[in-house]
Amino acid sequence: MLFLMGVLALLLTTPNANADDKEKYKLFAEETRKEVWALKLPEFTNTAVQDKYKDESAVILAAHSRLEITKKTRFNVGAFLGGFHYIDREVNCRDLYRMLVQINDKAALKEFSEFDYKAEIRKKDWRYDENYQQVLGVRIIKPDGTVNEISTDEYMTATEGKKDQEQLQKLAVPGLEIGDKIDIFFFNYTSLENHNLDPF
């Protein structure tokens, strides 16, 4: 009876847990987009297309990338209280790639009108915890200079994998037309934590 009650409780709480995960990711994505769009990058302000590139399907007008890696090592107090000597090692990686692209024809329009990517992946066992999150940011710059940021509400979310550990997002970019510029970035955050026995 207790087992059945436990299973029922798990079934009742799982949807709420999934909903919480989606909400946490949404907030993370919103904060990431604010941070990236606020970066002072002069190369993204000069959006003129040189005449020699006007017949190209798409022209990359600016590109920016950065990679940040941090490492932490700490003693696992919880494991110590249980009679084990564990050292936790955590590595965090933040990887950003952003580019500004001029859309000149239908082929380029098709290529940059839809995106499909894995937004979040979680893996965990007794040896390690791994979390991966990816955020897509898109802005459309019209020929008159008007900037339209694609709302978070336009991103469609789904889950797959064992225990819904993989969160997918899809985006059909609304309002993108030939002659527009698309300002786009991918931000990848990876956190890996290893649990190792202290060799002493």
Q: Which role does the model predict for each range below?
A:
Residues 20-200:
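Beta-strand-rich, non-transmembrane domain signature
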Residues 11-14, 104:
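Charged, amphipathic alpha-helical interaction segments
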Residues 2-11:
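Bacterial N-terminal signal peptides
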Residues 15-19:
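Sec/Tat signal peptide C-region and signal peptidase I cleavage site
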